[in-house]
A protein has these predicted regions:
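Single-stranded nucleic-acid-binding OB-fold domains
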Residues: 1-91
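Extended, charge-rich, solvent-exposed interface segments
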Residues: 84-104
Length: 104
């Protein structure tokens, strides 16, 4: 069961994430094998910093409904990649206005 995470700056590889973030960048990128579809590459931020994120499943659907500047609720897990880390997102949706404080 996901728990409310700390700020982005406090995340560590292996953490389960249930949080709200701002989308700074969103790009739909085809897999090397085009028959496999695409994944959604995101740059997410909060007041403490930013982190890369990926939506591997149903990426086209997510990309169609999300834009830079949207505040989203995400659920996923922090994973290592090369010299950094990213969030592998399992669920993502736009946050409702009553769910977030824009000061965060």
């Amino acid at each position: 069961m996901p728990t409310k995470t700390r700020l982005i700056a406090d995340l560590h590889v292996g953490d389960v994430v249930l949080s709200y973030c701002l989308i700074k960048r969103a790009r739909l990128i085809p897999f090397k094998d085009p028959a496999s579809g695409s994944f959604l590459s995101l740059l997410l931020s909060d007041r403490s910093g930013q982190i890369s994120a990926r939506v591997w499943e149903r990426a086209e659907q997510s990309a169609a409904s999300l834009n830079p500047g949207d505040v989203v609720k995400i659920q996923g897990k922090v994973r290592a990649y090369q010299d950094g880390m990213y969030i592998a997102i399992r669920q993502i949706r736009r946050a409702r206005p009553d769910e977030v404080d824009l000061a965060d």
